[in-house]
């Protein structure tokens, strides 16, 4: 069992664990040798090595956006996103070579904005990382993306909010 959360909150293990528990996304490398977690509150990418003999060990923690959160009233250990929370990873999938992510970056207040229904704050980019945590590429789609999956490294499928939840076929490295 792995219980060593990266120190991202500055407030200790319980808050770090809460940040990683709140709507985080997870992807596993095809050979099961690595696992990645991306936080929704802030954008923290945590990549771990999985070894049957050595157990689980950290590979890279990449702090893209600082995890700013709001405490839930009457529940001291619970947190949620707030107006100043950078929204991080909304979706994640993996191949043997790359992590394909929807990394947003908008602030929580934009999710509650009056025009959010007509102009929703979803990302239009697929952000691609290698399994060592290096940013490899961003593919701009021109569509507001809500979910994605990949088929190897040549094709991603994504759900676009813009066109009544249409399914897009995207070639991320073209």
Predicted regions and their residues:
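Beta-propeller blade signature
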Residues: 1, 47-50, 114-135, 171-173
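Surface-exposed loop and turn segments in beta-propeller and other repeat-based domains
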Residues: 1-21, 51-84, 142-144
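Short consensus segments that form the blades of beta-propeller domains
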Residues: 16-17, 35-38, 113-119
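Structural signature of eukaryotic scaffold interfaces centered on beta-propeller domains
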Residues: 18-41, 84-95, 148-151
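Residue position within the beta-strands of beta-propeller blades
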Residues: 37, 101-102, 157-159
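Short glycine/acidic-enriched loop and turn motifs that connect beta-strands
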Residues: 41-44, 106-110, 162-165
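Loop/turn-rich, solvent-exposed surfaces of beta-rich toroidal or solenoidal domains
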Residues: 82-129
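Blade-level signature of beta-propeller repeat domains, shared across WD40, Kelch, NHL, RCC1
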Residues: 149-174
């Amino acid at each position: 069992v792995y219980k060593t959360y990266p120190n991202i909150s500055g407030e200790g293990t319980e808050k770090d664990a809460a940040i990683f528990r709140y709507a985080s996304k997870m992807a596993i490398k095809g050979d099961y040798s690595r696992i990645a977690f991306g936080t929704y509150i802030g954008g923290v990418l945590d990549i771990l090595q999985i070894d049957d003999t050595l157990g689980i060990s950290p590979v890279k923690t990449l702090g893209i956006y600082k995890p700013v959160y709001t405490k839930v009233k009457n529940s001291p250990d619970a947190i949620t996103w707030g107006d100043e929370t950078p929204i991080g990873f909304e979706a994640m999938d993996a191949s043997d070579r790359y992590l394909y992510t929807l990394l947003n970056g908008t602030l929580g207040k934009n999710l509650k904005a009056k025009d959010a229904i007509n102009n929703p704050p979803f990302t239009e980019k697929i952000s691609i990382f290698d399994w060592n945590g290096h940013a490899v590429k961003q593919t701009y789609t021109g569509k507001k993306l809500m979910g994605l999956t990949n088929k190897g490294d040549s094709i991603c499928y994504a759900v676009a909010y813009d066109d009544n939840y249409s399914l897009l076929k995207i070639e991320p490295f073209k």
